[in-house]
Amino acid sequence: MADNKTTATELLERLHKMAIFRLSLGSKELFHSNFLEYLWDCDKESFKEIIRNLCGDNQVLTADQKYFISREKENFDVCIYHTSNNEEDGKAVYDVIIENKVKSIPYKEQLAEYVGKVADKKQEKSPAYLLLSLAKDFPDKEDEEIKDTWKVVHYGTLRDAIWAQEKWRSEPFVEEYCDFIKTLDELGAAILDGMDREYLFPNVEDYKKERLHDLYIKMRCSWFATALKTELGKNIDKRKIRIVSKYEERLPDCVNLNVAMNQGNGQIAAWICDRNMNTFEIVIQGDQYRHGINQIGIKKSKSKEIENDYYQVKENDRASFKHFVLNWLYGRLENLQDVNAYYFLNFLDDFNCFNSNQSDIRPESKKEKVYYFRKTKTPKAGPFDCYSDDYIYRYVSISNCTVHTLRDKMLNDILRIFYNLPDLS
């Protein structure tokens, strides 16, 4: 962990002065793969020793045969392999697979895909799988499939292993590289230090200058999602909590958690689906906390149009308001089965701990509020919004909400909708 006296600002300034850091910005993960290949070329035996130490297996890369290293071969970040004819372009038998996750979040599905790709080759012996991660914790880290197959190695550990090879210290760039990843490791710790007491993204602008804002956002989102998953596991069967890399991977009767960058903002999403894949979502995106409903096969409402781009409804007419929202969601009024869908969206009044932007609710008069439902795909600030005919959401601002409070709120909302899923059939 970073020294308490070394602030994130000081670490960013230290990185700024490193030429090797500037060179890494072109492709952060490919850069590290390239440097591993460079170390292999410097001294193969020392590199093999490092791999054995990191894998915790003294039998790796010990056979009396010629080994080769490659980057991006069959989409593996780095692989070490041998061939039956001892020629580099021969049929590869993989001995070590290395996956780099410097700025990205490891996902079980992606890692399982790599393992499956090797399994399809029906090798006599499985390779060693090494996952290099800057984040010490990520949502899928404790998954049994990952723990049984992949050796997760933190970049700080990689730095120590490289520096322990004294013969490498005189090689060009090795000292600079070790100093670079040591500083990056300390910065990663500083990014998360005291996070539970802070806002979710309070200092993102500080990282943009060094083009590290994506790293800052992803690490904090990953930490948040990991903590959220842990708390969910105390209330829901852990087999029903899934980490997914994209919306299309969600499954019914599960809490599908996603961490991503969306339009330059950090996103932490919980997608809960019924058997028809109608989806209720609880999403943090940037400084917004959203509840949304995405219904399959919805048709456009024939409600009265206003201003060419909006539907209008008055809140004081409660029956009309509910029917409008639900009719808009479901397409046909006669299909309405459960008004809980409306109450799922109507959550602003429960957010006393958040600073709701009251300007988002535009009053037509002092006595009643008028809501505008956007019909176009371009979002507009408002208490309700939509991107298409089948998706509506509502949001509040969370710019002044601590991570601890936000996590508890999201946890409670997920449990509420998971155990009381509205019927959209």
Residue ranges with predicted function:
Residues 39, 117, 121, 328, ...:
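Conserved short hydrophobic interaction patches
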Residues 47-73, 246-248, 254-260:
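A short acidic/basic microdomain associated with nuclease active sites
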Residues 26, 30, 174, 214, ...:
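Generic detection of long, well-ordered alpha-helical segments
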Residues 37, 48-55, 115, 229, ...:
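Generic solvent-exposed, charged/amphipathic alpha-helical segments
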Residues 2-56:
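A structured, charge-rich N-terminal accessory region that forms the first stable segment of a protein
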Residues 384-425:
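Charge-dense, extended regions
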Residues 202-387:
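Polyanion-binding interface signature
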Residues 2-11, 15, 71-74, 80-253, ...:
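Acidic metal-coordinating catalytic centers involved in nucleic-acid phosphodiester chemistry
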